[in-house]
Design a protein with these regions (language model features):
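Conserved N-terminal entry element of GNAT/NAT acetyltransferase domains
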Residues: 1-18, 165-166
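Acetyl-CoA-dependent GNAT
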Residues: 8-11, 19-87, 91-93, 104, ...
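Short hydrophobic/aromatic beta-strand or adjacent loop that forms the aromatic wall/cage
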Residues: 47, 155-162
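Active-site acidic-Proline motif in GNAT/NAT acetyltransferases
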Residues: 91-93, 97, 125-126
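Conserved active-site alpha-helix within GNAT-family acetyltransferase domains
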Residues: 101, 126-143
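Conserved GNAT acetyl-CoA-binding A-motif
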Residues: 111-123
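Conserved beta-strand-loop-alpha-helix junction that forms the acyl-donor binding cleft
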Residues: 121-131, 148-152
């Protein structure tokens, strides 16, 4: 892990990572929209993209969403010292090696330093592995269940959880 660094991404790094996600995706249309939305949100200061780089290559990411207007079902998930986390992704060949855990700790410390008191996230009910990981990270407070809609109209069920940073 000595060549692994955690950082807040810049716009150029975001473009590289989003292009990678588009390239490996089966449904490119959603990913193209999400790329444009997130780069615009970054420019407006509405998100903080956290990246993990190994030997200069982006291998994992997470995004803190700071504004209720950009989070679906945002009531109780973002605002007043609460930030919504999304886009937890690690390139397949680096999964299970502790890289994302290091990035997650970096992100949480940065958000604490910025004054946030709670973080929230959403997970699909059938994503049992992810739910166990999030529980391990301390997301034990069930907030609510709801539906989210992708740009192409696909609806998904989502369970929302919170973690105190105090």
């Amino acid at each position: 892990m000595e060549n692994f660094i955690c950082k807040i991404a810049n716009e150029e790094e975001m473009k590289i990572k989003w292009d990678y996600e588009i390239e490996i995706s089966d449904n490119k249309s959603n990913w193209i929209i999400w790329k444009d939305e997130n780069i615009d949100r970054f420019k407006k200061g509405l998100i903080i993209p956290y990246y993990g780089l190994l030997d200069g290559k982006i291998i994992c990411e997470a995004t803190a969403m700071l504004n209720s207007e950009i989070v679906q079902n945002s009531d109780g998930l973002v605002g007043n010292g609460v930030v919504y986390l999304s886009a937890f992704r690690t390139n397949k060949e680096y999964q299970g090696k502790g890289y994302f855990s290091k990035l997650f700790k970096f992100m949480i410390e940065d958000l604490k330093e910025k004054g946030y008191e709670k973080v929230t996230l959403g997970v699909e009910p059938e994503e049992i592995k992810n739910k166990k990981i999030y529980n391990h990270y301390g997301f034990n407070e069930h907030i609510k269940n709801s539906k989210e809609v992708y740009p192409d109209g696909t609806e998904i069920e989502v369970e929302y959880y919170g973690k105190s940073l105090k």
